[in-house]
């Protein structure tokens, strides 16, 4: 006779939309807030930007942690003068540019302050001018969300 054991599996549970990856949740997930604040207080904005992009909380299940990280990034990029944005964007790698673009889109969703939204749009335009529209496509199509 034929073996029909394979018919006992429910294949619907293997659908990618229902897949939940097991992530290791660690205490050091997200940017180091004290280090970023020290850089901001000493007006070393480029170091603050690099520090805030080092450890994004992708894959973390706690949304409050992700929101705090997004608001911290918004605070850092709002501290830059408009004339310094282009120079700072040109120093970013492709990976950091994509990470920053993810933060910007999430910050646009969370922030309601018009001055912060203006700085977010300025950064967005500079990122698009350096990395092209592919940056937008990579952010929107990536499964790692903030």
Curated annotation (Swiss-Prot):
The subcellular localization recorded is: Cytoplasm, Cytoskeleton
Q: Give the CC-aspect GO terms.
A: Arp2/3 protein complex; cytoplasm
Picking any one GO biological process from the record gives:
Arp2/3 complex-mediated actin nucleation
The record's comment on protein family reads: Belongs to the ARPC5 family.
Q: What is this protein called?
A: Probable actin-related protein 2/3 complex subunit 5
Gene3D superfamilies attached here? Actin-related protein 2/3 complex subunit 5 (1.25.40.190)
Q: Which UniProt keywords apply?
A: Actin-binding, Cytoplasm, Cytoskeleton
User: Quaternary structure per UniProt?
Assistant: Component of the Arp2/3 complex composed of ARP2, ARP3, ARPC1B/p41-ARC, ARPC2/p34-ARC, ARPC3/p21-ARC, ARPC4/p20-ARC and ARPC5/p16-ARC.
Superkingdom of source: Eukaryota
Role, per record? Functions as a component of the Arp2/3 complex which is involved in regulation of actin polymerization and together with an activating nucleation-promoting factor (NPF) mediates the formation of branched actin networks.
> Does the record carry Acetylation as a key word?
no
Indicate where this protein is primarily found.
cytoplasm
GO MF terms on file? Answer: actin filament binding
């Amino acid at each position: 006779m034929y073996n029909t054991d394979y018919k006992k599996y429910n294949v619907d549970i293997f659908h990618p939309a229902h897949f939940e990856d097991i992530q290791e949740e660690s205490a050091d997930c997200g940017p180091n807030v004290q280090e970023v604040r020290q850089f901001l207080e000493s007006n070393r904005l480029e170091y603050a930007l690099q520090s805030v992009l080092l450890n994004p909380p992708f894959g973390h299940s706690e949304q409050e942690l992700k929101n705090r990280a997004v608001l911290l990034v918004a605070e850092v990029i709002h501290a830059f003068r408009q004339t310094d944005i282009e120079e700072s964007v040109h120093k970013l790698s492709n990976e950091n540019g994509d990470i920053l673009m993810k933060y910007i889109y999430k910050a646009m969703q969370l922030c309601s302050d018009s001055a912060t939204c203006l700085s977010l749009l300025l950064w967005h335009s500079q990122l698009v001018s350096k990395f092209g529209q592919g940056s937008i496509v990579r952010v929107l199509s990536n499964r790692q969300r903030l």
